[in-house]
Amino acid sequence: MSEKDKMITRRDALRNIAVVVGSVATTTMMGVGVADAGSMPKAAVQYQDTPKGKDHCSVCAQFIAPHSCKVVAGNISPNGWCVAFVPKSA
């Protein structure tokens, strides 16, 4: 195979971009993709009612006082913790 045969043509690149954009649009319309805020089951994020060291829900950027979260579904403890923990910025 020659060097010229290995090159991607502009037509091929545009076709590939169109396929990717179409796939993303179709996936979005089907409702597949990023979960809605507050819809992840506790088990999926390994939620626990106790803190992990100094990390706990009340100091997490995802926490919505008094007992909600942008990621985890249902009521949560301000002293809880999960793998979605993101410390609040100072």
From Swiss-Prot:
Its main location: periplasm. Predicted to be exported by the Tat system. The position of the signal peptide cleavage has been experimentally proven. It comes from the Bacteria. The keyword Metal-binding applies. Residues 1-37 form the signal peptide. [4Fe-4S] cluster binds at C57, C60, C69, C82. Its EC number is 1.16.3.-. One of its GO terms (biological process) is aerobic electron transport chain. It is an enzyme of class 1 (oxidoreductase). Coiled coil: none annotated. Keywords: 4Fe-4S, Electron transport, Iron, Iron-sulfur, Metal-binding, Oxidoreductase, Periplasm, Signal, Transport. GO terms for cellular component: periplasmic space. GO terms for molecular function: 4 iron, 4 sulfur cluster binding; electron transfer activity; metal ion binding; oxidoreductase activity. It is found in: Periplasm. Catalyzes the oxidation of Fe(2+) to Fe(3+) coupled to cytochrome c552 reduction. Belongs to the high-potential iron-sulfur protein (HiPIP) family. NCBIfam families: Feoxidase_Iro (NF041615), TAT_signal_seq (TIGR01409). Homomultimer. This is Iron oxidase. The gene is iro.
